[in-house]
């Protein structure tokens, strides 16, 4: 790993049926980011991910979309970390969060999975909770205590509405702008900016 490399891993599920789902926000953000720099993703089997890279200022940004399905995200993240011999402070996980309102962002440098199966698997495979994660709120499903789990699954796997997408596009832009400034702004300042953002 070089000092000027930044590793961004967006979580989601591969497959056409999941492309526009709320659970695929990590993928959708990275696709938006890569298009800005005309970068194309290619499948890297050894990394269990689709991958692209581009340069911003003096930094090389490496973007990954795991091809393992959400619940096995840790397999891809561990493969990436081991292959590049990465210090985890250079890794940023992009993930959806059902406990955050739509349009809210939360940057955490460590912590539990919060019930998110993708984060849970990463913690299990890396054997640590100490890694950066940028959580993007997708809001909660309607309350129905008798079908709570079913409601949650259908909500995260459900497609993003056009109204939600309008909000999320602003969120993606804010996160991308913050990631672009990693080499010129203090990380604590970036964390504060993201955590105070709400569209």
Swiss-Prot record:
Gene3D superfamilies registered for this protein in UniProt: Peptidyl-tRNA hydrolase
Record keyword RNA-binding present: yes
BP term (GO), one: protein quality control for misfolded or incompletely synthesized proteins
Subcellular location: Cytoplasm
Site entry: Discriminates between blocked and unblocked aminoacyl-tRNA: 13
Source organism superkingdom: Bacteria
Protein name, as recorded: Peptidyl-tRNA hydrolase
Species, as recorded: Prochlorococcus marinus (strain MIT 9515)
Gene name of the encoded protein: pth
